[in-house]
Amino acid sequence: VTDIPQPVPPPHDLAAADPSAPIATRGFFTSLRHLTRSDFGSSIVEFAILLIFSGYFLLYGLMPYFGGSQLGLVGADEPRYAQIAREMLAAHSTDCHEVHARIAPHSLRPNDIHASYECLMGGTVTPILYGKPWLEKPALYYWRAMGFYKEFGVSDWSARLPSASATLALIILAFLHLRRFRPGGHLDAALIMVSSVAIVAFARGASTDMQLAAPFSIGMLGWYAWYETGKKFWLFDLYFFGAAATLAKGPVAPFLAFCIILLFLGLRREWSALRRTIWIPGVLLYLAMVLPWYIAVQRRNPTFFHEFFYEHNVERFATDLYRHHQPFYYYAVVLVVGLLPWTALSFRALVDGLQTSIAEWKARFTPRRYVGHVRAGDAFPEFLVLWALFPIVFFSFSGSKLPGYILPSIPPLAILTGDYLFRIRRAGIPPWLLNTHAIFTGFVTFVLILCPQYLVYQRIVPAPRIFGWAAVLGVAAALLIIFVGRRFGVKHLRLITMVPLTALLYFLLGRNGHLLDLNYSARPLARQIAQATPDGATVACLDVRRDIVYGLAFYRNQFISNYAVQGVPDDAHILVIPTHDADQLQHFLQGRLYQQIFLYETQGLSVYKVYPKT
């Protein structure tokens, strides 16, 4: 039998199974697909998704390099805290210049070390506002803002970077912690956390709220990691980040941590764990971080203890001294709004965690029925439930209530939600819950599209065209979530919910940020005053809102006097007054010449030039 010669295959570069897909290209995409499906590749993809969304929600419209600094400092707290950090930095630079030193000594000689110590202490101990001590809050925010000022210059957006960077650290560390201890729902939890209304809002504020919530939450996760593993290493998180939170807002941080841990261990009857939590190296680390500043500021300001601990902690909780009274149910409303658009899912996850915890507690207090845990991690829902609920319940009894007080409750609720979504992936999300989540997302879309109509144009009834577009887009967002949830399952719910949120943030800041700036910040007013009077004249005010006064003080870097408090300056100056109060000028400026420079109609203000007293 004669062998039949087989055809010789052509060279590989000429033979392709799919002419439209060359082998090299197919090989690249096949390798990429295998990589993304591997544990390492999926981790890289998840982390990239997290960084992209976190960077967008925390920084877009905040920095000049990313959407522009769209909104100036708003409210009274933001410009006040930003100005304190600026004055502390100026005092610090002056003191360092006087001793010809930096924080890092030039050498190990005693004189250089002493000079560096004087430089370190100069301007960093006592918070100062308009040259006087301001002792309402500890110094962590001011220190961090000083660092960003030195790096990027003094600006409103650099004053907000301490909160944005603290939030980013919280999101990343929470993601890594959950990936290590609760894999599966870690990406959902992190994305829910970074996109909730409360986190997005406070992460963009030049305030102390996120300086407390972020390290406090990281420390609590560290404590539970120690509880589950028994490794002392994790207790460093509790004490280190607990100290940072104490330097941010004072004794409320260790108080909340102690109460939550005490409740958790008490309900589990594990009192020995409470004793083991008191770890000497951790306690020493905490004291080494906290005591130097508290001792130093008390020595330099003998009234600090009374003003800070008593007035701004005890009296603030026990009374309505600072006029922040709200009804008892106030934080229920704040929670509903702060968790948007994830409110329905978060409340369902909280109820699920609460049901699990109650069942555990009932079984635990019935010894004959209690057979123990299947795994050590079963206690995590109990811990998260107590962590989420205690600040809400505790501050509901406070005489003063502000939204930021319950910010530490948002991270555990986001974690509960992410874990809940992971656990129901196989069974699927109940239709009523999917529909409710879609309605909440559609409602958020509808309301935020109408926001410029209410906030900028002050329209009770919005323009019909805008109302129609808001309704259509709100319904479209809801239907999109319902379709994806039913067709592709729970796994894709997180990303499809992010689509309208991403567009809404661009709409609010990218398209309407300048309008919000004109109506709610003093920055445009300060710019207009600077253009009209480039000589840097003194500015005074009469019957102007506190946020405008503090805002002008920051943007002009000068104290803004008040006619009703400090009197009328004798020198030439600029006066800012509500337009409807202009008839008071004759009373305050008898015999003085003055003329109107311009009207700032968006905030109902008039600006006058007042000539020197003759």
Locations of the language-model features?
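Membrane-integral, polyisoprenol-dependent glycosyltransferases
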Residues: T2-P431, C451, T602-G604
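Membrane-embedded architecture of ER/inner-membrane glycosylation machinery
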Residues: D3-Q6, L14-A15, P22-S43, F236, ...
